[in-house]
From Swiss-Prot:
Disulfide bonds join C75-C96, C311-C319. Pectinolytic enzymes consist of four classes of enzymes: pectin lyase, polygalacturonase, pectin methylesterase and rhamnogalacturonase. Among pectinolytic enzymes, pectin lyase is the most important in depolymerization of pectin, since it cleaves internal glycosidic bonds of highly methylated pectins. SUPFAM superfamilies: Pectin lyase-like (SSF51126). GO terms for cellular component: extracellular region. Its EC number is 4.2.2.10. The gene is pelE. It is found in: Secreted. It catalyses: Eliminative cleavage of (1->4)-alpha-D-galacturonan methyl ester to give oligosaccharides with 4-deoxy-6-O-methyl-alpha-D-galact-4-enuronosyl groups at their non-reducing ends. This is Probable pectin lyase E. GO terms for molecular function: pectate lyase activity; pectin lyase activity. GO terms for biological process: cell wall organization; pectin catabolic process. InterPro entries: Pec_lyase (IPR002022), Pectin_lyas_fold (IPR012334), Pectin_lyase_fold/virulence (IPR011050), PEL (IPR045032).
Length: 370
């Protein structure tokens, strides 16, 4: 699809800061007069409208039950069931195979997110702006800012029960200070269509869950990145209590992870197939015994002391080393994909030690002054 150019529109004053990394220049609703929805219907109307919108929300917008319920077939394919801390899988894509199925009832609102239209800014006022039981979808759209909200409670008992943030065929989207928790499936799901100029920053992937596919209170469903030519800056995020897909780096995704913290992972962090490409610098891995799953076939650069200067040509500076505490090895020096960074806006990187404590405390919907 063709995307409009938005450089002429100023970013609204309701937004804190400006997008770092690949999404630099995003303006969202631009200079549109802010609107303040008080009901879920008003919020959906503004998010899906054809005109630019600057949307400010405060408090909890509770979608649970708003679209009714629906019965699906499900099965238990994991070692634990929802009754003892596990997840069942909805048989929507035939994932149950020959395993016996049974009827379950899910909340329809959580199953699929709101289809956000182009040229939108959504900002939470204070630290309590929550979408309870509803995610957000970005499909064939551009120029969007989402800041200072939490998305939670998307049919967490059931795999395929709901993704927090879904992207497909998009351009210039900035996700900032967003908390995601208690989900049926992915915190971030990038489809096979290209997603360009994406930045996820200052956000909290809270994987602690009552319903775990790995039966240990950790979510397996972190970030699924399978786009044909995605560009994602991952800056100052806190990835906590996951057991896999953190990220699943596949497709032809260019993933620049800078000054983020991975903590308390019970399985593995990075996995992937195909030609996923990841540059990791200035990050902290704390209690992540397996950083990269065995058999990863993409390209990774882990910014070791001996190879930092390899970044100079494409990034305009040396890379910054990562830091490790009670974690496994992470030693990769694939740099053949560095040419893909040329002419892209590159975020600066601080030392890992300087962000080790600030990122976990600042990430998520923590902006009290918005």
């Amino acid at each position: 699809m063709a995307f409009a150019h938005h450089a002429e529109a100023a970013q609204s004053s309701i937004v804190s800061g400006s997008a770092p990394g690949f999404a630099a220049g995003v303006t969202g609703g631009g200079d549109a007069t802010p609107v303040y929805p008080t009901t879920i219907d008003e919020l959906k109307e503004y998010l899906t409208s054809s005109s630019p919108q600057n949307i400010v929300i405060e408090g909890t917008f509770d979608f649970v039950g708003s679209e009714g319920t629906k019965t699906y077939q499900a099965c238990n394919i994991y070692d634990c069931t929802p009754d003892n801390g596990g997840q069942a899988i909805l048989n929507t894509l035939g994932g149950c195979g020959d395993t016996s199925t049974y009827d379950v009832t899910i909340d329809v609102a959580g199953y699929q997110g709101i289809n956000v239209a182009s040229d939108k800014t959504l900002v939470g006022k204070g630290t309590g702006a929550v979408l309870n039981g509803k995610g957000l979808r970005f499909v064939g759209v551009s120029n969007i800012i989402i800041q200072n909200i939490e998305i939670t409670n998307l049919n967490p008992k059931y795999v395929w029960g709901g993704d927090a943030l879904t992207f497909s065929d998009t351009n210039q989207i900035w996700i900032d200070h967003v908390t995601t928790s208690s989900l049926g499936r992915q915190h971030y799901s990038f489809g096979q269509e290209s997603d360009n100029a994406i930045t996820i920053s200052n956000s909290f992937i809270n994987g602690k869950t009552d319903y775990s596919a790995t039966c240990d209170g950790h979510t397996y469903w972190g970030l699924e990145l399978v786009g044909s030519s995605d560009q994602i800056t991952f800056y100052k995020n806190y990835v906590y209590y996951t057991s896999g897909r953190s990220p699943a780096l596949s497709g032809n995704t260019l993933f620049h992870a800078v000054n983020s913290v991975w903590a308390d992972n019970s399985g593995h962090a990075i996995e992937g197939t195909d030609n996923g490409m990841g540059l990791f610098e200035g990050n902290v891995f704390n209690n992540v015994p397996t950083i990269v799953q065995s058999g990863f076939v993409g390209q990774l650069f882990s910014s070791e002391s001996a190879n930092l200067s390899q970044c100079e040509t494409s990034l305009g500076r040396d890379c910054v080393t990562n830091a490790y505490t009670s974690s496994g090895s992470f030693s990769y020096d694939d740099d053949g994909f560095f040419v893909d960074f040329e002419n892209l806006p590159i975020v600066s990187a601080a030392s890992a030690s300087s962000i080790a404590s600030t990122v976990p405390s600042d990430a998520g919907n923590t902006l009290s002054s918005t």
